[in-house]
Amino acid sequence: MNTPQQLDNVETKFQLSLKTKVWQGVFGDTGDLWVGYTQDSHWQVYNSQNSRPFRETDYEPEAILMFNTHYELFGWDGRVLGIGVDHQSNGRSDPLSRSWNRVIADVGFERDGWTVMVRPWWRIPESRVNDNNPDISNYMGRGDMQIIHEWNGQELGLMLRSSLRGGSENHGAAQLTWSFPLVGNLRGYAEAFKGYGESLIDYNHNASYVGVGISLLDWY
């Protein structure tokens, strides 16, 4: 793309997340197979000069094998352990195509209204010819940690992501979220993001975002 896009700083973001259990008791009485799908769309709804385009849409299907666990570690209850396969792409052709495939481990802990999820991952290698973002792990990271606290129907979340590298390959992101009940299933939602990888097309750009909106359901 030779002509730079004339984009507004203010846009609308839609997120659709679905997750369901497709097989309970994969190994007799243990192990449940879940499949999920997440879609993020960034809409330049206020950009009337350029026909209000969708700036970016990212698609992320995944399959996860989860195990319930019961152990204690430093006063925290180990609740879940999982392993999954994840594909994320923006569905575009070169030179704007962005995608990667990962194997992701999930380890979850709970304690007194707090939940901590630790997710290290490994990127599945691609051939040099097909890889349109070979350095994506240095920006989107090699793992993240999510900390969630629930109280009085409200939920505060912190996501920390890191490349787990030093020097020029040291990049990451942080996101703070807050959701609270409004009416029925509607919840108010606010978020602040700083770092790399808020969307795939901008994976190697350091950016800051602040947003407010509504959500129908909360899950993580």
Predicted feature residues:
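Outer-membrane beta-barrel "beta-signal"
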Residues: 207-220
